[in-house]
């Protein structure tokens, strides 16, 4: 099964989206947006930037866990991954975002 985006609204009226892999696992989480339209633009940005290797910023947290940020051409963070135990599992996560990030399916939960 192909991946999809889920768009949601928080209790304080902010919006965010997550990218889900075909197995339902969240593989990318957006920043908070003040409007639904801005969150939808963020989804469009994932679609255009996720296939490009140079858009992935690989990081190590202070606790030694590995994660990545997907960035737009203007270097703004579009979304962040979960924490991974190994650098190799982070690479698998990046591959999953590349494979699922162009999905046209959006489940609107707002």
From Swiss-Prot:
<dbReference type="InterPro" id="IPR051141">
    <property type="entry name" value="UPF0339_domain"/>
</dbReference>
<dbReference type="InterPro" id="IPR036913">
    <property type="entry name" value="YegP-like_sf"/>
</dbReference>
<dbReference type="InterPro" id="IPR010879">
    <property type="entry name" value="DUF1508"/>
</dbReference>
<keyword id="KW-0677">Repeat</keyword>
<feature type="repeat" description="1">
    <location>
        <begin position="10"/>
        <end position="58"/>
    </location>
</feature>
<comment type="similarity">
    <text>Belongs to the UPF0339 family. Duplicated subfamily.</text>
</comment>
<feature type="repeat" description="2">
    <location>
        <begin position="61"/>
        <end position="109"/>
    </location>
</feature>
<protein>
    <recommendedName>
        <fullName>UPF0339 protein YegP</fullName>
    </recommendedName>
</protein>
<dbReference type="Pfam" id="PF07411">
    <property type="entry name" value="DUF1508"/>
</dbReference>
